[in-house]
């Protein structure tokens, strides 16, 4: 639950930073603001430069740059997943401590301190840093949000088309939003075993939100979501699902 709280805090921080300069105006080298100058514009420039190399295809540019960013962030994602697995391995002992000292508001302040002390000792003995899984998010989220704004605010993208859709308009056939929703569902579902029961509702909420957004926002964003989701599905299979399968086979 604390990890989820940190994620929310990070999103709010990045959103506040973005709000200082991301007013929806087209992004250029002259656009002012730290967020614009150091995050959004560089990615906008990369999108335009890659499109120039691909005969002016901004659709292919979005695909290539999305994959490039995901590859760049891959080591951080792997580190985060290793941390999650380490915390998951400690879950039985952590739950035993919670049971030992009582739950939530029923817990005496002194018992709370004792439990925290034992938890810290458990982390230290196991070589686990409970914050290690959150640290990569401080890098990943700003980059992915900056890329989102770069797509939205690179004015020239809206003037181009790709396959059957205009990048600056919603998909008229609703194919991209639906595919984005399906791939989002598959991606979250593949790691649902890591979620507690209260958080599993996100499996169904996120895809619906993506579909609704995809129906109203430019197709360039839906394309970005689809490509990013497909990359994450492949990554998750090899770094999480396949790992769990091998671990199960070894235990047999």
Swiss-Prot record:
Keyword Lipoprotein annotated: yes
- Per the record, GO CC terms? plasma membrane
> Which InterPro entries does the annotation name?
YidC/ALB3/OXA1/COX18, YidC/Oxa/ALB_C, YidC/YidC1/YidC2_Firmicutes, YidC_ALB_C
Q: Where is the lipid attached (S-diacylglycerol cysteine)?
A: 20
Is Membrane there in the keyword field? yes
Q: Transmembrane segments in this chain: where?
A: 34-54, 58-78, 131-151, 162-182, 201-221, 223-243
Annotated GO biological processes are: protein insertion into membrane; protein transport
Membrane topology category:
Multi-pass membrane protein
Pfam family membership, one: 60KD_IMP
| Lipid tethering residues (N-palmitoyl cysteine) | 20
* Listed PROSITE patterns: PROKAR_LIPOPROTEIN (PS51257)
Q: Which GO terms describe its molecular function?
A: membrane insertase activity
Subcellular location(s) of the protein: Cell membrane
Keyword annotations of the record: Cell membrane, Chaperone, Lipoprotein, Membrane, Palmitate, Protein transport, Signal, Transmembrane, Transmembrane helix, Transport
Highest rank taxon of the organism: Bacteria
Which positions make up the signal peptide?
1-19
Which family, according to UniProt? Belongs to the OXA1/ALB3/YidC family. Type 2 subfamily.
Function description: Required for the insertion and/or proper folding and/or complex formation of integral membrane proteins into the membrane. Involved in integration of membrane proteins that insert both dependently and independently of the Sec translocase complex, as well as at least some lipoproteins.
Q: Which PANTHER family match?
A: CYTOCHROME C OXIDASE ASSEMBLY PROTEIN COX18, MITOCHONDRIAL (PTHR12428:SF65), OXA1 (PTHR12428)
**Listed name of the protein:** Membrane protein insertase YidC
**Gene name in the database record:** yidC
């Amino acid at each position: 639950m604390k990890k989820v709280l940190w994620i929310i805090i990070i999103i709010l921080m990045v959103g506040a930073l973005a709000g200082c300069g991301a007013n929806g105006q087209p992004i250029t080298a002259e656009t002012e603001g730290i967020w614009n100058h150091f995050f959004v514009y560089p990615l906008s420039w990369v999108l335009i430069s890659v499109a120039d190399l691909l005969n002016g295809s901004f659709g292919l540019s979005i695909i290539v740059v999305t994959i490039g960013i995901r590859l760049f962030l891959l080591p951080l994602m792997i580190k985060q997943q290793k941390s999650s697995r380490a915390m998951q391995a400690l879950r039985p002992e952590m739950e035993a401590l919670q049971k030992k000292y009582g739950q939530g508001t029923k817990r005496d302040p002194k018992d709370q301190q004792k439990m925290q002390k034992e938890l810290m000792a458990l982390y230290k003995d196991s070589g686990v840093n409970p914050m290690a899984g959150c640290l990569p998010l401080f890098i990943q989220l700003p980059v992915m949000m900056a890329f989102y704004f770069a797509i939205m605010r690179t004015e020239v993208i809206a003037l181009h088309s790709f396959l059957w859709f205009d990048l600056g308009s919603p998909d008229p056939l609703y194919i991209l939003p639906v595919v984005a929703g399906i791939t989002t569902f598959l991606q979250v579902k593949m790691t649902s075993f890591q979620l507690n029961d209260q958080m599993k509702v996100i499996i169904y909420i996120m895809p619906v939100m993506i579909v609704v957004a995809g129906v109203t926002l430019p197709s360039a964003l839906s394309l970005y979501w689809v490509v990013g989701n497909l990359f994450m599905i492949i990554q998750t299979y090899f770094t999480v699902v396949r790992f769990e399968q091998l671990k199960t086979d070894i235990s047999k």
